[in-house]
Swiss-Prot record:
Quaternary data: Component of the tRNA splicing endonuclease complex, composed of CLP1, TSEN2, TSEN15, TSEN34 and TSEN54. Component of pre-mRNA cleavage complex II (CF-II). Also associates with numerous components of the pre-mRNA cleavage complex I (CF-I/CFIm), including NUDT21, CPSF2, CPSF3, CPSF6 and CPSF7. Interacts with CSTF2 and SYMPK.
Cross-referenced CDD domains: SIMIBI (cd01983)
Pfam families the record matches: Clp1, CLP1_N, CLP1_P
Gene Ontology cellular component list: cytosol; mRNA cleavage factor complex; nucleoplasm; nucleus; tRNA-intron endonuclease complex
Protein name: Polyribonucleotide 5'-hydroxyl-kinase Clp1
Length: 425
């Protein structure tokens, strides 16, 4: 490892990595860092690095560059931390991928379906990273796996507050992640499943149905299987939601990260044919504060409207109150004694409640449903995209929105989220 200064006053450090080691670094707030592979081969979460190409990572990025055979790397810019580690679970993760690939080959031979894998564990154990790794390794072998995102707090397939699926056709971009050109997305409306667990489980089942339908008509998708990312809520209703997801998707393999108790509970409660594997988390996994999570969510939403590093220009336009119908999924809970005869609180959770446009709608995100009419079940219909309300004019009965596409809105049924986005940058 050697340090030198370059022309533009950015500190530059070279790292020589031995085989099966990784360089871990975190980017300082309001800084950016450039990484370059000078010699050898290396990868980031399963995506191979191109030699002599500079990759840029923005403030808050937490990165691990792994090499199987040794390499030479250069970092330019201010990092909060940068060190090389020999202690990595990558070999175990690779073994998991190899076992899944054997299952795919067997599925091909025997005209069956490929492995459906669910990655579970508490918060901050690296679930999304393991998903990305398994998907990248599969797609590098010519597979076309489906990525299923059940983590409403993160929304890596779309934005936070949604659940969705993405057909993976190429490895994730080192800087931008997976290409999200045509995801299948459903509105959940909040960043925690506990706000409406009945809706959460219903959308999980819906995603499983749609995935099954795709597998019936697309042999390659069926053989490639899916990788399911889940929430970090693993107790009580959160645990029940994991069991429900495993059942809905008929998973074959459950990868449990870093929690023996959860591993034993799932081993006990899931059918005996489900292979449950306990894997360690990487030493590079960092605990994220509430503030950091909130910033990441905001950044994810900002990226939806403005593109990666601001490459898009969103549209602002007025929408008449009379042109749209806005709903919220789930009525407020009321005492059981006040419910109509034969109705339970659970029925209430799936109820569509009309929303009258008002000033309290400002900054809220709205999902634009693909539904043609309310006779379709709005909560189980996918969404075309999202808009954010920037102002409400009660006098003229219009509200102004920020939208990634120009007017008019493709459909007139909107679902309101609890999530707000303040466009301050």
């Amino acid at each position: 490892m050697g340090e030198e200064a370059n022309d533009d006053k950015k500190p530059t450090t070279k790292f020589e990595l031995e085989r099966e080691t990784e360089l871990r670094f975190e980017v300082e707030a309001s800084q950016s860092v450039q990484l370059e592979l000078l010699a050898g081969m290396a990868e980031i979460f399963g995506t191979e690095l191109t030699r002599n190409k500079k990759f840029t990572f923005d403030a808050g990025a937490k990165v691990a560059v792994f090499t199987w055979h040794g390499c030479s790397l250069q970092l330019s810019g201010r990092t909060e931390v940068a060190y090389v580690s020999k202690d990595t679970p990558m070999l175990l993760y690779l073994n998991t991928h190899t076992a899944l690939e054997q299952m795919r080959r067997q599925a091909e031979k025997e005209e069956e379906r490929g492995p459906r894998v669910m990655v579970v564990g508490p918060t901050d154990v690296g679930k999304s990273t393991v998903c990305r790794l398994l998907l990248n390794y599969a797609v590098r072998l010519g597979r076309r796996p489906t990525y299923v995102e059940l983590d409403v707090g993160q929304g890596s397939v779309s934005i936070p507050g949604t659940m969705g699926a993405l057909y993976i056709e190429r490895p994730a971009d080192v800087e931008e992640g997976f290409s999200i050109q045509a995801p299948l997305v459903y509105h959940f409306g909040s960043t925690t499943p506990g706000t409406n667990i009945k809706l959460y489980n219903k959308i999980t089942s819906r995603l499983a149905d749609v995935f099954n339908q795709r597998c019936e008509v697309n042999r390659r998708a069926s053989v490639s299987g899916c990788v399911i990312n889940t929430c970090g809520w693993v107790k009580g209703s959160g645990y029940q939601a994991l069991v429900h997801a495993a059942s809905a998707f008929e998973v074959d393999v459950v990868v449990v990260l870093d929690q023996e108790r959860l591993y034993n509970e799932l081993k006990r409660d899931l059918p005996h044919f489900v292979r449950t594997v306990l894997l360690p988390k990487s030493g590079g996994v960092v605990e994220r504060s509430k503030d950091f999570r909130r910033e990441c969510r905001d950044e994810r939403i900002r990226e939806y409207f403005y593109g990666f590093r601001g490459c898009f220009y969103p549209h602002a336009f007025n929408v008449k109150f009379s042109d749209v119908k806005i709903y919220k999924v789930g009525a407020p809970t009321i005492p059981d004694s006040c419910l109509p005869l034969g109705m339970s609180q659970e029925d209430n959770q799936l109820k569509l409640v009309p929303v009258t446009p008002g000033r309290d709608m400002v900054h809220h995100l709205l999902s634009v449903s693909t539904a043609e009419g309310t006779e379709e079940n709005l909560s189980e219909t996918s969404v075309a995209g999202f808009i954010v309300v920037t102002s409400v004019d009660l006098e003229h009965q219009v509200f102004t929105v920020l939208s990634p596409a120009p007017r008019p809105l493709p459909k007139n049924f909107l679902l309101i989220m609890d999530i707000r986005f303040m466009d301050l940058k």
